Amino acid sequence: MHHEMQETLDWQTSRLAAILAGSVDLIILPENSNVTGYRDLDEMLSILRGPSVAYVQTLQKEADRIGAVIMAGLMTQDEKGVLRNQLGVFQPGKPAITPYTKNHLVVPELKKGIKPGDEANLFEINGVKYGCAICYDFYFPELFCHYAKLRADVVVIVSHQRQEPTDNLLFLTRARAFDTGCTILRSAPAMDIPAIGGRSIAVAPNGKVIADAGGTPGVISFDFDPHARFIRPASYTETDRVVDYRESLQPACRPELYFK
């Protein structure tokens, strides 16, 4: 394992250690946060079976100490040796869960034998219904329209884009907020060039940016209402058309035209 990988693990855990107990409700860490920066399969497996074990244990300990839910992108390997790119969820006083597995895999992941997910369900924590997307999932609007149909309250995106311009990531995140009709929370590591990759960002259902880390490393904190909705203005001079944007779209959807 090269030193940058350990530095990244240490950076994340040190930021968690600096959070005061009771000061936040939800913490989100990027895709592959336990093996970020690996260069090949052997290196990934080395850290997954080594330092990653202590890192994941730290996530649970910090969730217990802070009293917050921690969501983190994790590479996992089951007892049969199957690799998956998943969202790990750590709740105070409860066993960790992995409610979502990355469904859309890039070719390098498939070549490593990583197995894609086969479902995209919501999971509920403290009365909030969450959906998830991991990196490449982000580029498939039908996933987000699916979450809109399920009435997600919040969609969490954990990512590790290395080449995408940050402006594109901002544009797409705002578009996904409209696709789902709910708040989008995106966590991703910054790259060496501020204009490439990164873009940890929170976007409200109306497409407005709540918080944005841009292309630089750091921690952003903010308040948001997980049950917020975009209320569209009246149209056609009908005052009763002032409705939840998402609810106004659902009855008009015609999936039979484009999902055959």
Can you say where each PLM-predicted feature lies in the sequence?
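Cys-nucleophile CN-hydrolase/nitrilase-fold catalytic domain and related Cys-dependent amidase chemistry
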Residues: H2-P92, Q163-F178
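Structural motif
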Residues: D25-L26, Y130, V154
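Active-site-proximal loop/turn and secondary-structure-junction residues that shape catalytic pockets
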Residues: S33-N34, T76, H104, Y136, ...
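Active-site catalytic loop in hydrolytic enzyme cores
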Residues: D78-L150, E164-F171, P233-T239
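C-terminal beta-strand edge segments of enzyme domains
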Residues: L122, A190-K260
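Active-site/binding-pocket entry motifs
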Residues: N34, V106, A228-F230
